[in-house]
Amino acid sequence: MAAPEVNPTSENERDAEENVDIPAGYTYFGQFVDHDLTLDDRPNDLTTPTAVSALVNLRTPQLDLDSLYGLGPVGSSALYQADGVHLLEGALLTGSTDVGAKDLPRSTTGRAIIGDPRNDENRIVAGIHSMFIRFHNQTVDRVLREQPTLSSEQVFTAARKIVVAQYQQLVLFDYLPRIADQRVIDSVMSDRGGRITTNLSLYSSCMQMPVEFAVAAYRFGHSQVRGLYRINAQVDRLPVFSGSFGTPGVDLVGFSPAPSNFGIDWSRFFSRSNAVEPDVQLSYKIDASITNSLSLLPLPVTSAGPADLAKRNLLRSSQLGLPSGQDVARAMGVRVLRDDEILIGKATGDTSEAVTVSALAPTLAGKTPLWAYILAESTATAYRVVNGAIVGAQRAPFRLGPVGSRIVAETFIGLLASDPNSLINVSQMQGQANTLRQLFDQVSQSRPVVSQGMPPRDSARQGARQPQLRPQAPRRRR
């Protein structure tokens, strides 16, 4: 597959860095998933050697949307409306084809009132969070219509089960096959008529987050970030971060109320099917390069060290003593890349934009850091690389290679297998949308329900029967 021609007039036109297989929205859905799985807010200088056993994850090691729900209506009451079942919603935004587009709910100081403040880092992940808020609230309204005698606690529990099941289905059958090698996924999980079985070899139990996933493999998304995005027809192309602080509208940085015309048109970020539609912006290739704007990101308040994201990722791997990519590949029994196949830089075919790891840093010959190895492995899977140069046309989709695919697939599938309430273990827990675009279209097109709402939690009816969840079976992606 020949790379698209570079248009020098705009970073947002089709160019050689784009991945024609993955729409741009999946970059930020991946970030949304990451924030659901991992959180460590302790101070970190990135240099003090740290034992993996000393790591603390403040998120549950489950795909359970605790970043959306917090500790629930009792433990995180500030996230919820007065009835204790609907989540707070933000101000309406214009500019989108979705007339119900909304900002995140915010305090009078502009702080987002959500389960994980990191989902306000940029306008795109904030928009995804807002869509899941609306999806939850619409699901609550549906449960109320179908089971009007339920107590508020029962309504919330039923709605959360439906939302989480839909989310898990999208992670497993929409997101994962776009980023990982389907052959690896099939070796880890089989789906026969809706009955899912697993074959986990790396992580037989994912009750704790694998460090290789959190610190290396799942950071591939940094390479997918585009230089510029158009969120709707009214707003010009903008970078994720411009280097300016406190000036809403010049970039897509969050942590403040969104400009009123920043409603996101999701048809620019997700396609309805496996085929990428003409107007959908594409992610950048999963390769060993990141866009310049990510080197300008502000430091987390808990961290010291360099602002450059690539350097931070490498320091974090070294701090935790992660094995090299070559060592992990050997342990998995997959082919180990030669040093001349490990390109650091853009996978465009331009030899001036990439260099072998051994030429860049001779001390890394034969022992490439796992994060960099996984990114370079993606390039070496999509293209034939010989003596530090891409040879011939693209031969495979730009997804994770054998090592990256195995770590990410086993983590996601292992998390679900370890959760007795997941869709892997509860067969009727299935969503109605097969892709994120389908879900967001459903949310956008849903008419608001005019209802009296629920009574306050302490006066809700008790003893009502639990609802039966009856969503239609999904069409599995193969």
Question: Model regions: which residues?
Answer:
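Terminal regions of secretory-pathway proteins
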Residues: M1-R118, N122-R123, D141-R478
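Active-site nucleophile-adjacent alpha helix/oxyanion-hole segment immediately C-terminal to the catalytic cysteine
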Residues: I133-D141
